[in-house]
Amino acid sequence: MISKVNKYPISFVKVIFAYSLYIALVFNYPLLAKVHAMFEMYPHDSEFFEYFFLFLLALTILFLLAILFFIFGTRYLLKPFIFLLLINSAILAYYKKNYGVSVDEGIITSLFDSIIEKNYHEVYDLLTNELFVKIVITALIPALPLYFIKIQYPKLLKEYVIRLSYICGMLIVWIAIVASNYKDISLTVRANRYLNKDVIPLYSVSSLLNIIKHSLSFKSAYVQLDEQPSIYKPEEEMVGIVVVGETARADHFSLNGYSRKTNPKLEKQNLSNFNNAYSCGTLTKTSVPCMFYVGDYASFDVAKANQRANLLDIITASGVAVTWFNNNSGCKHVCDQVKTIDLTKIYSEEQYDEQLIIELDKILDNNKSKKTLLVLHSMGSHGPKYYKRYPKEFDKFQPSCKNNNPQECSKEELINAYDNTILYTDHFLDLLINKLKKQNKKSFLIYASDHGESLGEHGLYLHGVPIKFAPEEQIHIPFFIWFSELYKQDRSFTILDAKTKISHEHYPHTILDAMQVTSKYFKKEKSLLR
């Protein structure tokens, strides 16, 4: 019987160093190979230093892991802690290898939000057979010895002395090694600061600790920014539609010069298109709160933004009827104070974005408000299941990727599937514009994507690279405005030059300007209307 298995006694110190060495070398081998390739491309004056730096990098990861185990791996927690870290490392290594993604605070909180908000489809989309095989081979099998060993600990006081001694000893050794060649080491590290995000699992562990730290910090009371905003001609009817796009790239919109006709319908509409627009984040978790933020853009912080009124709150306070329609992963607290219609809770299965129009019609048909703002959070081009974002009749570009793992499709198949999502977005937005035309009122539509998407460039897939390291593909977004003829007849204005570099910072002020809402937080110089 399993309960009678003889367990081999072994010191807790040996267990800690054995698993620290395994994680440091097996899961971080790609990082070490990356650094080696870096030296081959940009050789150092001394070949000895190149190998010395590789040794130091591996030793640093080993020591940090061991210190982590010595601090948190107490006698009752060491085995489960090692097990969890192995599982965590296997998952991180899989996503780093397959998608080029480093799991940071943004991705972790986004994942937690998806679970809390019951947006399980986002989690399911990332689960693959290859991932489970990776977990079994690199985590579960190496964890088996933990069952067959009995970890030996000395008396409690002696155990603490041993733990402290090893921690101090490792720090002394590390400092001595670094001090022996500090100048070259510091120069190399400063020139490659991004490498820290590739360390598995330490970068994600530190990100998780930061999240815990922030969650335990004091939260200030909700701040109402502007209790008395006003609106121009409150008795006049006007309908505004704001579409929050998902994962759309500017360079895959034919509106922006893409060789394929991915926007055949929008090209026939009289749009004001901006082809040099950039997002403020690479995750919906960050971008959506940022898009509706009306404070100092340079000091934007998601946690602080959630504790103060946003664009929608100000517009609502001016007397406009605001409704948020969700077909995505939630509004990230932006719509907490306004009416919300959530398709993910109405329907048991994922819906195409056209379903948003059916729900929108119900509001417009029974609308008694003079001023209305409808915000649609679309599913857009959300990956990795691009093929599930559009009906079969929009599967125009062939062959298209039908795999949940984009890296397993050819480049042609992947781009075809992604372009089909843009083609469907074109159709969806065209339907909205035509619906506004039929309203025969002053109306407008503003569209901007929350962020872009990597399709294999530089070995990256999906999105989520920290903004300061993010490639062009993940931050260059489509952004356009449409105004009805009645709107243009009633109001004299010009539009900012299409080639001007803009960002999400212009988004909330443009919406305020389009709705003609006056607020002390409105910055005319940040509006795209002149």
What is the role of each PLM region?
Residues 1-196:
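Transmembrane and membrane-interface helices of multi-pass
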Residues 45, 192-195, 299-301, 411-426, ...:
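Active-site rim elements
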Residues 71-80, 99, 103, 314, ...:
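Catalytic cores of PAPS-dependent sulfotransferases
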Residues 178-402, 476, 503-504, 509-530:
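Active-site-proximal alpha/beta segments of enzymes that process anionic O-linked groups
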Residues 199-202, 358-361, 401-445, 481, ...:
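A long, amphipathic alpha-helix that forms part
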Residues 232-233, 437, 469-472:
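Short secondary-structure boundary/capping segments
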Residues 257-261, 441-442, 446-487, 522-524:
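Histidine-centered active-site microenvironments of extracellular/periplasmic hydrolases
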Residues 391-413, 487-491:
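Flexible internal linker/loop segments at domain or repeat junctions
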